[in-house]
């Protein structure tokens, strides 16, 4: 039975493992401690953690090793609160955590950001004198503090480690990279090398990530040369993909594509990274070209590819391509399991102005969230369909979904573009009391537009005076646009001077002011 259970765990076959479990019960072997531990281990490996926990509770004797397996399983599945609960329960039974327990539970603390628990565990480790026994615990402590953003403590632990290694440094480097602190990452890499330690793949992955986020292209080029000299591009595809990411984030997409094309091996992630880079820089035709080239190489798009390429289709209005991709998604049955992909489809159709299709896709999604409705509402707003937007807004709330800042911006924008003054005023008035949302600059801008469009200029001034700050070029351009329609020279002059104060080279403000004079049959 033990051998069969090990095999079931190795291949992740929970169904076969459950059948073995039933056989164990029917033969009365459940009291056997070794067999019970094997059962629990099988369920953990199959990610059936509730079943594993049930087996553990039924064991005649529970040992630290059994608890460690369950705690590690919960941490791996991201159920860190359950891992912490198991940690407490284990100690309440009189069992003493070992190094393996502490490593897992520190990871849980770092993932959840529960720094108080982490500090408490740190004290227990110090009290038992465990830090001097290998690097595992020290590295886990550094990782926990770094993930919680407590870098002073992470550095202190690192400095106190007598036998720190590249993993120790990587834990600190990864934390700084996650926080976008590029200078600290670079400094850590230099300090690590002064200790005679060589950066490894993980070091470079963290380094390239933060250099991309901070657009530190000069250092990025140096790191690229170092990677080539070390021959890492031939050893790990992740390094090449991270280089593509770094150049893409820095806006050097031609270089990113050149790096990709020179990789000895490229995969779907390589192409997804480049396609996403082109999308972020609004070079959507290039993204579509990469999509075709990737498939010509025999690589199949995954969910991430489809999400990126649907965004490109929406931005370029490539509705035929978007429909073709939609068909591929349906054929692969991907909409059943991924709400982000469904939302991307709604967004693509909405941006292309095919609003009936966008709504149909939304209504057919197995699960809808606020983002789903926001995508449709943004489409209605973009095309000035106020009544439809208000209808969707009501239906969304009837489904029990709570509007967020983006939702209210979309509805206000739809009202402003379709002249729905009363509806806009009611929504704006209720934002704080009904929805608990303080109006943002974008919300005020929408109100300025809707009030200006119907000539309520006294209310426009009141709205601007109520804003947290009037230093918004978008607001004053909205006022100028409204004044152009109605020929309101007095308010137009005020808006023009405010726009010039914020941006003296704004050509749009000059054009709008000239049009205001023209519509009022006046000369400047």
Predicted features along the sequence, with ranges:
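Inter-helix linker motif
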Residues: 12, 28, 59, 63, ...
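Intrinsically disordered, low-complexity repeat/linker tracts enriched for polar/charged residues
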Residues: 19, 76-81, 89-91, 120-122, ...
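Methionine-biased hydrophobic packing positions in alpha-helices, especially
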Residues: 40-42, 59, 90, 144, ...
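Pentatricopeptide repeat
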Residues: 1-4, 17, 32, 36-37, ...
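Accessory end-domains appended to solenoid repeat scaffolds used in host defense
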Residues: 156, 462-468, 477, 490-511, ...
């Amino acid at each position: 039975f033990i051998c069969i259970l090990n095999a079931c765990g190795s291949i992740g076959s929970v169904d076969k493992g459950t059948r073995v479990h039933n056989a164990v019960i029917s033969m009365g072997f459940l009291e056997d401690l070794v067999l019970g531990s094997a059962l629990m281990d099988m369920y953990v490996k199959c990610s059936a953690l509730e079943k594993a926990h049930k087996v553990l509770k039924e064991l005649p004797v529970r040992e630290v090793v059994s608890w460690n397996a369950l705690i590690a399983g919960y941490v791996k599945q991201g159920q860190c609160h359950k891992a912490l609960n198991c940690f407490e329960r284990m100690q309440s039974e009189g069992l003493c955590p070992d190094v393996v327990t502490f490593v897992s539970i520190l990871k849980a603390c770092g993932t959840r950001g529960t720094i108080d628990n982490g500090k408490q565990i740190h004290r227990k480790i110090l009290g038992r004198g465990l830090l001097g026994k290998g690097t595992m615990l020290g590295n886990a402590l550094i990782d926990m503090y770094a993930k919680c953003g407590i870098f002073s403590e992470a550095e202190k632990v690192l400095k106190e480690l007598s036998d720190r290694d590249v993993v120790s440094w990587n834990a600190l480097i990864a934390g700084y990279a996650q926080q976008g602190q590029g200078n600290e990452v670079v400094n850590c890499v230099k300090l690590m090398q002064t200790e005679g330690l060589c950066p490894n793949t993980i070091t470079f992955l963290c380094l390239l990530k933060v250099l991309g986020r901070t657009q530190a292209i000069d250092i990025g080029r140096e790191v690229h040369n170092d990677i080539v000299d070390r021959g890492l591009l031939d050893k790990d595809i992740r390094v090449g993909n991270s280089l593509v990411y770094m150049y893409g984030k820095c806006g050097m997409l031609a270089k990113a594509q050149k790096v990709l094309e020179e990789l000895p091996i490229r995969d779907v992630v390589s192409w997804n990274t480049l396609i996403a880079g082109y999308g972020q820089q609004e070079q959507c035709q290039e993204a579509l070209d990469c999509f075709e080239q990737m498939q010509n190489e025999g690589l199949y798009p995954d969910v991430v590819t489809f999400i990126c390429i649907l965004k490109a289709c929406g931005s370029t209005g490539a509705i035929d391509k978007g429909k073709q991709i939609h068909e591929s998604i349906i054929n692969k049955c991907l909409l059943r399991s991924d709400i982000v992909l469904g939302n991307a489809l709604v967004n693509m159709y909405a941006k292309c102005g095919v609003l009936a299709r966008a709504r149909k896709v939304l209504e057919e999604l197995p699960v809808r969230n606020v983002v789903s409705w926001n995508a449709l509402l943004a489409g209605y707003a973009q095309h000035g369909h106020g009544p439809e937007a208000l209808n969707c807004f009501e239906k969304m709330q009837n489904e029990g979904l709570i509007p967020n800042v983006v939702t209210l911006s979309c509805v206000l924008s739809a009202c402003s573009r379709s002249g729905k003054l009363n509806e806009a005023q009611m929504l704006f008035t209720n934002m704080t009391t009904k929805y608990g949302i303080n109006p943002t600059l974008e919300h005020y801008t929408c109100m300025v537009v809707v009030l200006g469009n119907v000539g309520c200029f006294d209310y426009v001034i009141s709205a601007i005076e109520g804003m947290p700050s009037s230093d918004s070029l978008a607001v004053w351009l909205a006022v100028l646009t409204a004044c152009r329609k109605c020929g309101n020279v007095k308010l137009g002059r005020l808006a023009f001077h405010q726009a010039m104060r914020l941006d003296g080279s704004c050509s749009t403000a000059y054009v709008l002011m000239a049009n205001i004079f023209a519509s009022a049959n006046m000369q400047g």
